[in-house]
Curated annotation (Swiss-Prot):
The protein's name: Protein ARABIDILLO 1
Protein's gene: FBX5
Organism from which the protein derives: Arabidopsis thaliana (Mouse-ear cress)
Entry-linked PANTHER family: PROTEIN ARABIDILLO 1 (PTHR46976:SF1)
Annotated compartments: Nucleus
Outcome when changing residue 6 to A: Prevents nuclear localization
Annotated tissue distribution: Expressed ubiquitously, with higher levels in root tip, pericycle and vasculature.
């Protein structure tokens, strides 16, 4: 696979640790000299003399890790870096946060107000921060958090005003913990919990009694809630039960419509019907907005389509226009509906009305949450919504002042375009809608944020969208390659992982490969492998996948090797146990080794300690993709003479024969590479004999019968090499290989497959196999071991070899009694006979000698076949033509060829091909003498 898309970030082990420096007391400005600007001292800037407030402002623009790095430069800046004003908020999500780390940070967290964390280990460690003044706590991946942990957190932080856990389900939290929240946090204003099984009346009534300021309440994706008790939380202004099941809507509408302050109600993704919706919109005196997005029961009923009969109330649903509904909240007809979010943001800058700000923030939050949840489950029938409204809503919400809304919207964009995660398939229409509305530029701006959470989600969206070639081009034109290459250098694993995914998808395009290398992307990707070699499979798979794509380019492959990529990829192939990483590492090594003589990467991979052994082991993987790429790598590496023998020593013959035997029902890609690797190894006579001895002939014959052109072509090549050995030739006959090769020779759409099948048959019946059969005691007319008639097989083979050769000759040439040998005629014959791909075949001296000897064979068909083969191997322009000509000249074959061309006993086909062969030799001789 050459690219990857991701729907949702998953919690992984091995998070990088927070860099913590010793705590120093805050310093004060003692005199005015400390406020002077940096001065030039001997040509250098004295950065220490920067005003303290300027340095503090600089610190605020950096993430925690960069703050720590900057603070390590000198004692003065260490003191400033520890200032409590820099530690009012803390995002622990990208880091491994445990009790010891919390204790190290505690002295800085006296004034900590806002905290975001991820996972149960971080939750258990929060109390060790001793941040008694915490106002807001937000956690995700909380499925393992228990009542005890949550109760302990709220008991130590009585000043909490906001608590959010989700969007994943809090499976182990019960109503007992909710009661603890109510008892311990009397100042609570906002509570949003996801995925709780049962929210009892006692828990809700405790909130109503002990949290008089609670105005924003959300029980999302819960199984059961007490509808009547919710009607007693009279302080609530904004209520969300999105995704919650088993709600009795008759009870809910009879109780919630009496809530005196209820301004916004979110019932998205529930089974609410039109009756309850009408009741809320007509009975509630305070309600302004009812959000009912993706409510299938409501959408199946057309009675509410003309929802504008509810004067002063706004219904947001899939059958309404969300932008129009939001715009109607403010009676300003001068604004275009799609500009409503921008209008709101300007309004929030100028207004001091906290109620309006809270209202707008709540709407942004619930819409972003519902859009993400809807994108994750990707229900059918929403294409029109996504194209006309959904994409634009997500892009608008990405510009929110709320960081979590921005992140969720970017994640929504990354998710809603994906059709199939495994096959890296996206919906082109949705992707184009994002690009049309300026989404690429917005995402790239978000990726440049100093906030690592935004960087990560924006990079993920860019990566998924870049599966589309047009969007990949737009990303490159907007400077996205440089941005992603920069993010790939991040010390935050989540950011680096998503950036590597973006480079992986962008590197599919040939036009982007060099740009990635020039932006430093190759080195960044290699460094990622060394930075997180263990336990970070997502990073490693994406880095290896991107390097695999880049290694397919000759120039970039040299950059990969120069950056240490060979060692890094071999390390992954040897040590990593995750199949996705193994597959991409093997593919990268295969591509590095695929450039032949244009660079020395093939030899370099083979010389890397443990490389060949690792690839041989990977051919035994239970995962088909790993086996396929490992076999492909061994195939490419086998073109190097030393590698070929080293692969054999590493057990490659046995492993690849076993692979070929087991892949009869596998994908064509695996079959092609298994046969190809055996083809490459069988160039060596010793390997050829070993392959035959290990049982490699039957599976290759089976693969030669494949309908897939690529498969039977590589199988024909392997059988051609094996047939050079008379023992293997006899095995091929005994195993029923002659009919398979005859079928290829006559019926394959691949000229190369037909050619190599004909050559294999010629090897088998040029007389050497008969001598071998006599030597081992088998009659020349019958093979007793398999009861196969050699004479019958020979006749069948020669008949089809002749038909194959004649298919490359214009029959009109032989109409006249005397065949012309003019240069024009010979050129015409050459043009018709040439098999372009045959120029890539490289024969040994023994093989060339065998074809020359075959010209002396009494059989006219074999003579013609030998001349035809030598013609193909020496045509000017062929990759190895000069090599073949040199072998023939060194063997002194020219005199014999002239004799054969002039002999009246030579068949006309062979005579013409021999004359062309002589002309080829003369051409190369003249060329080499210049």
């Amino acid at each position: 696979m050459s690219r990857r898309v991701r729907r949702k970030l998953e919690e992984e082990k091995g998070k990088d640790k927070v860099v913590v420096l010793p705590s120093y007391p805050e310093t004060s400005i003692s005199n005015e000299e400390d406020l002077v600007a940096p001065e030039l001292l001997h040509g250098f800037v004295d950065w220490i003399s920067l005003p303290y407030d300027t340095v503090l402002q600089l610190f605020t623009c950096l993430n925690y890790r960069d703050r720590a790095s900057l603070a390590s430069t000198c004692k003065t800046w260490r003191c400033l870096g520890a200032s409590s004003c820099l530690w009012t908020s803390l995002d622990l999500r990208p880091h491994k946060f445990d009790a010891s780390m919390a204790a190290s940070l505690a002295s800085r967290c006296v004034n900590l107000h806002y905290l975001r964390f991820r996972g149960v280990e971080s939750a258990d460690s929060l109390i060790h921060l001793k941040a008694r003044n915490l106002i807001e706590v937000s956690g995700d991946y909380c499925k393992k958090i228990t009542d005890a942990t949550l109760s302990m957190i709220v008991a130590r932080h009585e000043a909490l005003e906001s608590l959010q856990l989700g969007p994943d389900f809090c499976e182990r939290i019960t109503s007992d913990a909710i009661k603890a929240v109510a008892f311990c946090c009397p100042k609570l204003k906002k509570l949003r919990l996801s995925g709780i099984r049962d929210v009892t009346s006692e828990a809700i009534e405790a909130l109503a009694k002990h949290c008089p300021q609670l105005n924003d309440l959300g029980f999302l994706d819960c199984l059961n809630i007490d509808e009547e008790a919710l009607g007693k939380v009279v302080s609530v202004r904004y209520l969300s039960v999105a995704g919650t099941s088993n709600i009795k809507w008759s009870i809910a509408s009879n109780n919630w419509d009496k809530l005196p302050k209820l301004t916004g109600l979110d019932v998205s993704r529930t089974d609410i019907g039109p009756t309850a919706v009408s009741r809320f919109l007509t009975s509630s005196q305070s309600l302004k907005v009812l959000c009912a997005l993706n409510c299938h029961v409501l959408e199946e009923d057309e009675s509410l389509i003309s929802y504008n009969r509810f004067k002063g109330k706004v219904l947001l649903a899939l059958f309404t226009n969300v932008f129009d509904g939001l715009a109607s909240i403010f009676a300003d007809n001068t604004k275009k509906p799609k500009d409503i979010f921008a209008y709101w943001r300007e309004l929030m800058k100028t207004t001091k009305d906290k109620t309006i700000n809270d209202f707008i923030h709540w709407i942004e939050w619930i819409i972003s949450h519902t859009l993400l949840r809807t994108a994750e489950c990707n229900p059918e029938g929403l294409d029109d919504f996504w194209l006309n409204e959904g994409a634009a809503l997500l892009l608008n919400l990405m510009q929110s002042s709320q960081e979590d809304v921005q992140e969720r919207s970017a994640t929504g964009l990354a998710t809603f375009v994906v059709v199939d995660d495994e096959n890296a398939s996206i919906d082109c229409g949705r992707a184009e809608a994002v690009m049309k509305d300026g989404g690429i530029r917005l995402l790239l701006e978000l990726a440049k944020s100093w906030r690592e959470g935004l960087q990560s989600e924006a990079a993920k969206a860019i990566a998924n969208l870049s599966v589309n070639a047009n969007i990949a081009k737009s990303v490159a034109e907007e400077g996205g390659i440089k941005i992603l290459a920069g993010l790939a250098k991040s010390m935050n694993r989540l950011v680096a992982e998503e950036a590597a995914g973006g480079l992986w998808n962008l590197s599919v395009g040939e036009e982007h490969k060099n740009a990635i290398a020039q932006a430093g992307g190759v080195k960044a990707l290699v460094d990622l492998i060394f930075r997180w070699p263990n336990g970070c499979d997502g990073v490693l798979e994406r880095a290896a996948g991107a390097l695999a794509n880049l290694a397919a380019d000759d120039k970039c492959s040299m950059e990969v090797a120069k950056a240490g990529g060979v060692h890094a990829l071999v390390m992954l192939a040897r040590n990593c146990k995750y199949e996705g990483v193994q597959e991409q590492a093997a593919r990268a090594l295969a591509n590095l080794a695929a450039h032949g003589d244009s660079n020395n990467n093939n030899a370099a991979v083979g010389q890397e300690a443990g490389a060949l052994e690792a690839l041989v082991q990977l051919t035994k993987s239970p995962h088909e993709g790993v086996r396929q790429e490992a076999a492909g790598a061994l195939w490419n590496l086998s073109f190097d003479d030393k590698n070929r023998e080293s692969i054999s020593v590493a057990g490659g013959v046995e492993a690849l024969v076993a692979l070929a035997q087991s892949c009869s029902n596998a994908s064509t890609g695996l079959q092609e590479r298994a046969a190809g690797a055996l083809w490459g190894l069988s160039v060596s006579e010793a390997n050829s004999v070993a392959i035959g001895r290990e049982g490699g002939v039957p599976p290759l014959i089976a693969l030669a019968r494949s309908e897939a052109e690529d498969v039977h072509e590589t199988a024909a090549g392997a059988l051609w090499n094996l047939a050079f050995n008379p023992g293997n030739a006899l095995r091929i006959v005994e195993e029923g290989g002659v009919p398979a090769l005859v079928h290829l020779c006559s019926s394959s759409v691949s000229k190369m497959a037909r050619f190599m099948a004909a050559l294999a048959l010629a090897y088998m019946f040029d007389g050497r196999m008969d001598e071998y059969a006599l030597m081992i005691g088998t009659s020349s007319s019958e093979s007793t071991s398999k009861n196969i008639s050699l004479d019958g097989a020979r006749n069948m083979a020669l008949k089809h070899i002749e038909a194959f050769v004649l298919s490359f000759i214009d029959p009109h040439i032989f109409e006249s009694p005397v065949v012309s040998s003019t240069p024009t005629m010979l050129a015409q014959v050459t043009e018709r006979a040439r098999i372009q791909e045959a120029g890539h075949l490289r024969c040994s001296g023994a093989e060339i000698g065998r074809f020359v000897t075959m010209l002396r064979n009494p059989d006219s068909t074999l003579k013609a076949c030998a001349a035809f083969a030598l013609l193909q191997f020496t045509i000017p322009g062929g990759r190895h033509a000069m090599h073949h000509v040199s072998l023939m000249q060194n063997g002194g074959e020219s005199r014999f060829l002239r004799s054969a061309a002039a002999s009246a006993k030579t068949p006309r086909e062979a005579k013409i091909f021999t004359k062309i062969l002589l002309r080829n030799l003369e051409h190369h001789q003249a060329e080499s003498s210049i």
